[in-house]
């Protein structure tokens, strides 16, 4: 009993971080939860972000999405130079709303099949909210590279867009995309009806 209580306490005090390794999800670490009060963003940004996520996770919101036949998911874009707090913001939101984090590392070697496997392999059997993180999306979906034909990506834009549109997302997915420079990204990714908040 004491051991089970210790495990439960550990889970309550930490955020589980999973990492996709080409074919499967592996737990990368458990990081201490970070109080929302320690998150410092530009004026109004923290309140706007937390209100959006809070509203998304409400049962009434889920019911509304499903009543209109819409995929129940939310996509948020965070952008800024390395070291500006994108990862910290995601960890803090995960802490505040008691979510697991599932990180998909974006590389030119990531295939369509691997991306679909990543989304379909997220554990939704537990009564646990989850955040999916697609990091540095601008590193492979760069509009200038696509114009020149230099992207050489195994992951196609069409598959990524299907993931963002919710067709391969688990129900209730809160998805964060990060980018160093949102201005270089393909406009098909950042159009307003695909990104709920940026």
Features from the language model and the residues they span:
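Walker A/P-loop NTP-binding motif of AAA+ ATPase domains
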Residues: 44-198
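AAA+ P-loop ATPase mechanoenzymes
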Residues: 1-63, 72-74, 107-110
């Amino acid at each position: 009993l004491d051991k089970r209580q210790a495990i439960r306490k550990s889970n309550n005090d930490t955020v589980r971080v999973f990492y996709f390794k080409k074919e499967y999800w592996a737990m990368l670490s458990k990081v201490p939860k970070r109080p929302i009060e320690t998150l410092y963003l530009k004026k109004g940004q923290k309140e706007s972000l937390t209100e959006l996520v809070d509203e998304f996770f409400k049962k009434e919101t889920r019911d509304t999405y499903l009543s209109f036949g819409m995929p129940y998911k939310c996509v948020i874009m965070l952008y800024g130079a390395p070291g500006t707090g994108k990862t910290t913001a995601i960890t803090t939101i995960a802490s505040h709303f008691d979510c697991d984090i599932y990180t998909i590392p974006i590389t030119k070697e990531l295939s369509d099949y691997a991306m679909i496997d990543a989304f379909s392999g997220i554990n939704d059997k537990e009564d646990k909210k989850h955040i999916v993180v697609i990091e540095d999306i601008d590193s492979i979906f760069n509009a200038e590279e696509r114009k020149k034909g230099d992207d050489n990506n195994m992951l196609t834009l069409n598959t990524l867009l299907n993931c963002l549109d919710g067709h391969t997302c688990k129900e209730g997915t809160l998805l964060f995309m990060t980018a160093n420079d949102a201005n270089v990204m393909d406009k098909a990714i950042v159009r307003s009806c695909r990104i709920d908040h940026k």
